[in-house]
């Protein structure tokens, strides 16, 4: 259903920028469609807030998170963007800035900018540190001023590089909000001095975070840390992210057994069905994959995307179910046991 009052409020807002108005009005138009097959019981869980689509909208027309293969882009350029493979640092940064403008996501901005140090390092020959820092400063400030959403991520490491060192120096200096950075840390590869430089930088500007490269490198053949620290396959990403909010679901429970054996399994099954329906529409009807130059040029592939599922409110749900007995999650053993209890019969 189209909500004209909400759209008009967006249209006449004096607090939103022009770009924010465009995105909000587009969301109003998207939500006017009813193209997904959603059964009544699933709609009930949406109405109560037990299932949350995290602002993905009623008619998915792009994946939630996209992680292009920026290395392939640098090697081959882009016919669609009429960009040849970059030959020097200026061309590299210009090419990346151009491509970022064309990488969609749920936020309408790129959520992943690549392993910037390994992309940049081969192009630093012939530039002094000061010259390179000036170019990187302009590059990072461009990202911060044009990607106006904090769910955006760049990666470093695990190996130390000159580009990585310079990026850390500039990050600490500019104190920008966007993008977030994560260092892929591997004790067998990452020198202590580089890890210490990353920690000092993080103390100065809250970037980069650190992730365990050994713990994550075998999950996918190549991965990136994207958006709000989501680890996903390069050349793919996440089709969708749907969350179950236990604090809302528990309001429908008649007791512990009803919640564990009936209500929670039903909600999870319907959540999975809903995610499948979103993916079906996105892949089969939206036209995104047949039309995107990111697909045509090999920067992403539909078989590299996966669904994401979230859950929140565990402690609150346990406390609600055991409130009559005064048991509290994190303090009482029986409450903690309920938090990790499995259904008694197979799913």
Say what each PLM segment does.
Residues 2-303, 324, 330-338, 342-346:
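Conserved catalytic cores of very large enzyme subunits
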Residues 316-324:
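Well-ordered alpha-helical scaffold segments within catalytic/enzyme domains
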Residues 111, 301-317:
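Conserved phosphate/anionic-ligand binding catalytic regions in large, soluble enzymes, centered on
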